[in-house]
Structures are given as structure tokens and as C-alpha cells.
């Protein structure tokens, strides 16, 4: 989503976690991470308030991201939840679109030990009269999302699974909405991620053309996701069973 919007001329802020190499990666504008100076400036300004209310690490970084995006006057911000959704620090926002990907068992001691329990937490990011896009997945999980969407009068759309998925040494190729795409990331799940992103883009700005989306996806790079180090070595940071699969 971020890469497509940037290729379309938007000034985009993105907040993700965790970081791979250094903290600055979590907060980026126009593809560039926040500077050390920007981090120090925020902490100097906010330290008294942080100490007063006892903010957690993630709460502090979330506010840092919001403040940085405000300073940089971004056109759109992409905010990834840290853990779950319902009680996540990021869930104070009023999004223009909510997006939920695949549900798998993770942080079970906090979110619950079944897909349905985790889905209830994830459904917390569905907001009143706000479009929500979700992965095609188990009916039990989709039912939970649908019930929350109905309660919030939110239009829920289930992203279709791409067709003709082919994974080879160059990445992943697939067909979505009768159009062909290629991404340099490896795995059928990356085709599904891209398909979901395309659906979100078409909802957010239907004027963005196929050529722009196609070119942007070909330039997507996410280090640590089946990253090819050399001819026979791949590097991946998956930390649970579903991620490895």
C-alpha cells in the first residue's frame, strides 16, 4: 500500500513494528526513516509527560510516529497495530480504511489461544461507517469480522485470492482482477498481500491506474522476508509456525 501510494505522488507516512536493524525503521516518511535528531527532539519535548503517566514503550513510539507525521504534513499515514487491535495504542485513530490480514496464533498469552479469540481482538479496529478489507480465510473468523462490521455499519469487503500464482527465482507472479502483476517477494502469501493492497488502493483512490500499481509492486522490498542473501541462502525473520509455513 505504501509503495503504491508513493508512486502515485502521495506523501506517505508509515508506522510498523518491530524493527529489523534499528529503531528508526519503525517511523518513515517518503521511504526515509525518522532521524536520530527527530527521535531525540520528541523525547526531550515529551519526557515529562511520559514519566507522569507511565507510558509504555509502544505507546511512546506510537505518539512519536503521529507527531512526526503531523510535522512532516503527510497526505496519508499507514498505521500497523502492534499487538491485537482492540486495546492497541494505535487504535485511538479514526481511519479512512481498516485492513485485517490473515489470523494466526501469536501472543496467545495476551490475545487468546484460538483464531476466533484473536479475531475478536483484531475486529476492534473496525470503526463506525469505515470501510474494512479482510483476507479470505476461515468462515468462523470471517463471521466475527462480519458481525462487528454490521454492528458498526461498516462496509466489509473480502479480498479474493489471486489466480495463476507462480513463485520462482525472480519473486512471485500472479493475476488479480484479470490483470497480471509481479513482486520481488517470495511466496503465495505475498501475492495475497498484494491483492489485498490493490483492493485497498482501489477503494482509497480509484483514479490510480494499473500501470502505476504494476510498477510500484515490482519495486516492493521488505528485508527479512525470505530475503535472498546469495545463491543458496535465504533469510527470514518469521517467529511463529504460521509465518514459517
Label the model's feature ranges.
Residues 3-7, 148:
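Rossmann-fold NAD(P)-dependent oxidoreductase module
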Residues 10, 130, 152-156, 206:
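Short glycine/serine/threonine/alanine-rich loop segments
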Residues 15-18, 135-136, 148-168, 184-188, ...:
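Beta-strand->loop->alpha-helix junctions that form or flank phosphate-binding loops
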Residues 18, 61-110, 142-180:
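Extended acidic/charged loop-beta regions that coordinate divalent cations
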Residues 127-136:
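Short loop-to-beta-strand entry elements in the cores of soluble alpha/beta enzymes
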Residues 71-72, 76-81, 88-99, 103-108, ...:
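Nucleotide phosphate-binding/pyrophosphate-handling subdomain across enzymes
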Residues 119-128:
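Membrane-proximal helix-turn-helix segments that form the acceptor-binding/catalytic region
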Residues 7-93, 111, 140:
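ATP-dependent carboxylate-amine ligase catalytic core
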